[in-house]
Amino acid sequence: MVVFSKVTASLACFSAVVSAAAVPVKSPRQGFSVNQVQKTVTGTRTVNLPGVYANALAKYGATVPANVHAAAVSGSAITTPEENDVEYLTPVKIGESTLNLDFDTGSADLWVFSTELSSAEQSGHDVYDVSSSGKKLTGASWSISYGDGSGASGDVYKDTVTVGGVKATGQAVEAAKKISQQFVQDKSNDGLLGLAFSSINTVSPKPQTTFFDTVKSDLDKPLFAVTLKHGAPGTYDFGYIDKKKFTGSLTYTDVDNSQGFWSFTADSYKVGTGSAGPSIEGIADTGTTLLLLDDGVVSDYYKKVDGAKNNYSAGGYVFPCDADLPDFTVTIGSYDAVVPGKHIKYAPVTTGSSSCFGGIQSNSGIGFSIFGDIFLKSQYVVFDAEGPRLGFAAQA
């Protein structure tokens, strides 16, 4: 069941009530916005750059190259990674608990830190209290694993999940019971809210419905729009398109959701002012930091960067931090989506290093590209379930 309630500033005004079978009562449908936040964490936080890369590959079933795995295990890291856009998070209320979650259009699970973890594992995190309001889904379980060896698993509960001002009751919540230290050490992140298609939800024995699929029929339009920012929190707009957030008009392209992802085909690409390259098939994924492309495209890009090289020990392409990087342009229909070179200068390989890790890396031959945050944070992107389709425009 979905219930709309009155909330604050960034929320469009609305009110609706639906039945237990998630069939809406005839009342006005509206939309709402939620702002990302940058959670303050006490002490120094580090991020393993090759681990970020390895996780992105493993998420889509790619074989993680031995050197990337070795670099991830060795722990090459930077400090204060939020400055380099590793992740911005969105407050979500689950039952009586409010957690900061990573919204991920590349997965379909809502999993969170919970009171089923040990007190040491909960420390520094906001956690979901499974005893406060949730109802355990008997016999259901979930498990995830990533390329750097991290993972989590646990039980499944049904509870009320509130994003902005929309409440989805009876929503599946995957409560962590076991979790790796990599997640425990990331004190800013309390879990993940998947926005891919429900067909790839990993709950066993029966996949569950995503938050968006639960509420979309009660929105003014069955869509959400993403405005990620470079070096700043962004917003997610549910049910409406905010014309103040983009310039020009939206260009739409069809989505192939047969594999459960927001997959699309870009007509061509260009490095700097160079000639156009061939089409690129890929997935729009807010849960992946990097822009992962075919080897030929990656090579084309870094040929234009002085001092760039595929560094075996670093686990990917690196270049001098003072290098000038060309823009990377993807053409979608009549629209040229430009990724500024400064966005591709991702982060120092280690704290104080003069070498930087590139935001464009190889997709390790998986057969499609991943348009992660490096690409998305210069675009206004509409994820429209009606079609389905994606709409693109330059951010205002």
Curated annotation (Swiss-Prot):
Top EC category: hydrolase
Subcellular localization(s) per the UniProt record: Secreted
Enzymatic reactions: Hydrolysis of proteins with broad specificity similar to that of pepsin A, preferring hydrophobic residues at P1 and P1', but also cleaving 20-Gly-|-Glu-21 in the B chain of insulin. Clots milk, and activates trypsinogen
Keyword Glycoprotein: yes
GO molecular function annotations of the record: aspartic-type endopeptidase activity
Gene Ontology terms: biological process: proteolysis
EC numbers on record: 3.4.23.20
An example Gene Ontology CC term for this record: extracellular region
Family named by the database record: Belongs to the peptidase A1 family.
Subunit and partners: Monomer.
Protein known as: Penicillopepsin-1
Organism: Penicillium rubens (strain ATCC 28089 / DSM 1075 / NRRL 1951 / Wisconsin 54-1255) (Penicillium chrysogenum)
